[in-house]
C-alpha cells in the first residue's frame, strides 16, 4: 500500500514539472514584451529630443552665418573708410609739408556794441569787430611744433588791420633726454611776456567779462622762453627785446620776466611774477612791449633823457569753485630813467578782485573791481578814457573800475555777454576823471 502511494506521488510530480516550467516561460515572455515596449517608448522620446536639438543647431548655425556675414561687411566698410580717410588726408596735406602731418587751424573773435561817456573810447556808440584772430598749430617733427597767430582785429586797434601775434617754434619736453618728463621745454620766436596770469584769459572767448582789469598787463615780444613743471610747481621765464618795434632792438639790455606757479590741490592756484623791461631807448624803442593801464610804459623824462625802464612784481591767487571762481592779484611797479635834470623815479601799486558764479546751468554773473595807485607823480594811464588825452596829457594819480556783467554760454565755443563798467579817477593836477563809464554787449566765438 505504501509503495503504491509513493509511486503515485512520483507519477504526479513527473507530470506537473513540465507544466510548471511552461508557466515560468509564459511569465518570462510577458516580462520581455513589457521591456521591449518601454524601450520603444524611450527610443521614440530620444528621437524627438534629437529632432528638437537638430532644429536648435540649425537655427544657431543660421545666426552664426548672419553674424559672420555682418562682421565681414563691417570689416569691408571699415577698410573702405580707412582708405578714404587716408586719401582725404593726402589731399588736404599742404604741398611741401614734410612734418608729421598734424596740422590744425582755428579762429577766435568777438563782435558787439560799445558805448561810453563823453570822455571814453566810444562816446558815439560803436558797432565793432572787437577781436578776430586766426591760429595755426603744426607738428614739425616729434616733440617740435610751430605756432602762429594772425590778428585781424584787436580791442586796442583803432581799425581792422593785419598784425602778427605770437609766432614761435616750440621744442617740447627737452628734459626727456635726461629722464625728466616735462621739466624743460623751450620756445623761440615771438611770445607773450610770461608775467602775471590775466593775459592768459584776456581773449573774448576766455574772459568772463568784456573789460579787463585796469592794470591789464600783457605784451608780445621776440625772444626765448623756457617753461616746464616739477610736481606741483610750474614755471615760465623769458628773455625778450623789451621794446615796441617788432623788427629791431635799440638797446643791448634785454627784458627779463618770469612766473612761478604752485598748485597744492585741484581747486587752488598760486603764482608769483617778476619783470624788468630792461633799458629802453627813449627815441628808438619809444614804448615798452609791455602794456599797462591800456597804454605802455614810456619815457617821462625831459629832452636829455635817453634811457628809461620799469620793474614790476605781482602775486596771483585763484580759487576754483564747483560753480564759479574767485581771482585776485596785486602788484608793484617802479619807473625810472636817466634824465640828467630831474628825478623821475616813481613807485605805484595795483590790484584786482574778481568773482564769477553760475546762476543757472548756462547763465552766469561776474564782478571785478580793480584800481591803480600811481602816487603823487602819477603815470600815463588810459583806462576807458581817450588814448590821446590820457596817455600823452596830464598824468593820472589814481583810478578805479567796477565791472558788472552777465553771460550766457551756449557752448564752450559761443558766449553772449553784457557788461556795465564804472570808472573814475584823479589827475596829478587835482582834476577828476569821469564820464568814462562804459556799456558793452558782445558775442564771443571760437572754432
What are these regions (language model features)?
Residues 1-9:
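Bacterial N-terminal signal peptides that target proteins for export
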Residues 8-18:
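Bacterial N-terminal signal peptides
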Residues 16-21, 430:
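Hydrophobic membrane-targeting alpha-helices
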Residues 21-110, 447:
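N-terminal periplasmic/intermembrane-space "pro-region" immediately following the signal or transit peptide
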Residues 31, 126-128, 135, 218, ...:
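Short secondary-structure boundary/capping elements
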Residues 51, 120-121, 147, 168-171, ...:
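Outer-membrane beta-barrel pore domains
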Residues 92-244, 250-276, 354-375:
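Outer membrane beta-barrel
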Amino acid at each position: 500500500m505504501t509503495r503504491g502511494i509513493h509511486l503515485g506521488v512520483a507519477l504526479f510530480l513527473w507530470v506537473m514539472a513540465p507544466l510548471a516550467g511552461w508557466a515560468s516561460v509564459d511569465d518570462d515572455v510577458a516580462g520581455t514584451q513589457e521591456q521591449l515596449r518601454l524601450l520603444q517608448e524611450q527610443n521614440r522620446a530620444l528621437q524627438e529630443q534629437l529632432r528638437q536639438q537638430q532644429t536648435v543647431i540649425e537655427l544657431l548655425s543660421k545666426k552664426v552665418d548672419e553674424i559672420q556675414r555682418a562682421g565681414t561687411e563691417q570689416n569691408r566698410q571699415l577698410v573702405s573708410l580707412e582708405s578714404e580717410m587716408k586719401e582725404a588726408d593726402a589731399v588736404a596735406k599742404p604741398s611741401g609739408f614734410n612734418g608729421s602731418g598734424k596740422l590744425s587751424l582755428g579762429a577766435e573773435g568777438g563782435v558787439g556794441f560799445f558805448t561810453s561817456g563823453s570822455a571814453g573810447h566810444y562816446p558815439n556808440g560803436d558797432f565793432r569787430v572787437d577781436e578776430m584772430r586766426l591760429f595755426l598749430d603744426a607738428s614739425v617733427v616729434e616733440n617740435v611744433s610751430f605756432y602762429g597767430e594772425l590778428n585781424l582785429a584787436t580791442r586796442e586797434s583803432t581799425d581792422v588791420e593785419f598784425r602778427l601775434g605770437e609766432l614761435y617754434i616750440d621744442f617740447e619736453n627737452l628734459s626727456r633726454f635726461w629722464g625728466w618728463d616735462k621739466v624743460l621745454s623751450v620756445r623761440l620766436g615771438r611770445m607773450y611776456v610770461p608775467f602775471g596770469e590775466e593775459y592768459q584769459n584776456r581773449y573774448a572767448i576766455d574772459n568772463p567779462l568784456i573789460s579787463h582789469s585796469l592794470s591789464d598787463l600783457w605784451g608780445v615780444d621776440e625772444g626765448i622762453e623756457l617753461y616746464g613743471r616739477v610736481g606741483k610747481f610750474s614755471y615760465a621765464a623769458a628773455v625778450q627785446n623789451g621794446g615796441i618795434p617788432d623788427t629791431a632792438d635799440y638797446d643791448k639790455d634785454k627784458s627779463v620776466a618770469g612766473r612761478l606757479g604752485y598748485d597744492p590741490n585741484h581747486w587752488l592756484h598760486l603764482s608769483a611774477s617778476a619783470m624788468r623791461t630792461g633799458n629802453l631807448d627813449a627815441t628808438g624803442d619809444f614804448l615798452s612791449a609791455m602794456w599797462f593801464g591800456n597804454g605802455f610804459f614810456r619815457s617821462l623824462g625831459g629832452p636829455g633823457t635817453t634811457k628809461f625802464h620799469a620793474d614790476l612784481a605781482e602775486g596771483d591767487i585763484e580759487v576754483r569753485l564747483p560753480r564759479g571762481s574767485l581771482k585776485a592779484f596785486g602788484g608793484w611797479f617802479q619807473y625810472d630813467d636817466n634824465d640828467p635834470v630831474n628825478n623821475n623815479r616813481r613807485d605805484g601799486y595795483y590790484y584786482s578782485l574778481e568773482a564769477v558764479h553760475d546762476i543757472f546751468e548756462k547763465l552766469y554773473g561776474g564782478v571785478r573791481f580793480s584800481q591803480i595807485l600811481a602816487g603823487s607823480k602819477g603815470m600815463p594811464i588810459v583806462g576807458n578814457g581817450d588814448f590821446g588825452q590820457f596817455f600823452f596829457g596830464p598824468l593820472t594819480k589814481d583810478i578805479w573800475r567796477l565791472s558788472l556783467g552777465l553771460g550766457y554760454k551756449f557752448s564752450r565755443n559761443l558766449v553772449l555777454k553784457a557788461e556795465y563798467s564804472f570808472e573814475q579817477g584823479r589827475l596829478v593836477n587835482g582834476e577828476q576823471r569821469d564820464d568814462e563809464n562804459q556799456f558793452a554787449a558782445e558775442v564771443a566765438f571760437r572754432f
